Amino acid sequence: MVKMIVGLGNPGSKYNDTKHNIGFMAIDRIVKNLDVNFTEDKNFKAEIGSDFINGEKIYFIKPTTFMNNSGIAVKALLTYYNISIKDMIIIYDDLDMEVGKIRFRQKGSAGGHNGIKSIIAHLGTQEFDRIKVGIGRPNGRMTVINHVLGKFDKNDEIMISNTLDKVDNAVKYYLQTNDFQKTMQKYNGLK
């Protein structure tokens, strides 16, 4: 069986470590101690890495389409590698959740997230597994765009690092158990 773990974000160094790139940050944390090297594939518009875990080929994906067109890369890779939607997890930021909180869902609307809107539009379904990482709402007069494209406050950096460890543990637990429902029950709502 083959699986695909996708972290959403924006390509380019100016977006490194921004809140909107929490999906890329999660992928980097997950592969940190694995034998994964990323190569940018311009045909698929993604950085692609892979490894074998428990005898299964796992693809780790960071779309380079920019957030709002993430569905282009996701659809192309699912099709090319013949991966079922049920064997894919999307990791992304959520404005409506407290900073550092994680939530697992098996289906649902985009909730205003343009990357998820793109994936839903290209796949033709809302039924795919996802891990949402809370980045909180902007304070005061800050716009949503400035908030999501901003970096985490110093106060939040340790919490986000711990959150990324939890996402790493959850994904590896899922890959061991092959059971997203069980993973949800164990890790949902952690902070």
From Swiss-Prot:
The record marks D93 as: Stabilizes the basic form of H active site to accept a proton. The active site is at H20. One of its GO terms (molecular function) is tRNA binding. Keywords: Cytoplasm, Hydrolase, RNA-binding, tRNA-binding. It is found in: Cytoplasm. It comes from the Bacteria. The keyword Cytoplasm applies. One of its GO terms (biological process) is rescue of stalled ribosome. CDD domains: PTH (cd00462). It is an enzyme of class 3 (hydrolase). InterPro entries: Pept_tRNA_hydro, Pept_tRNA_hydro_CS, Pept_tRNA_hydro_sf. TRNA binds at Y15, F66, N68, N114. Its EC number is 3.1.1.29. Belongs to the PTH family. PANTHER family: PEPTIDYL-TRNA HYDROLASE. Hydrolyzes ribosome-free peptidyl-tRNAs (with 1 or more amino acids incorporated), which drop off the ribosome during protein synthesis, or as a result of ribosome stalling. This is Peptidyl-tRNA hydrolase. It comes from Streptococcus agalactiae serotype Ia (strain ATCC 27591 / A909 / CDC SS700).
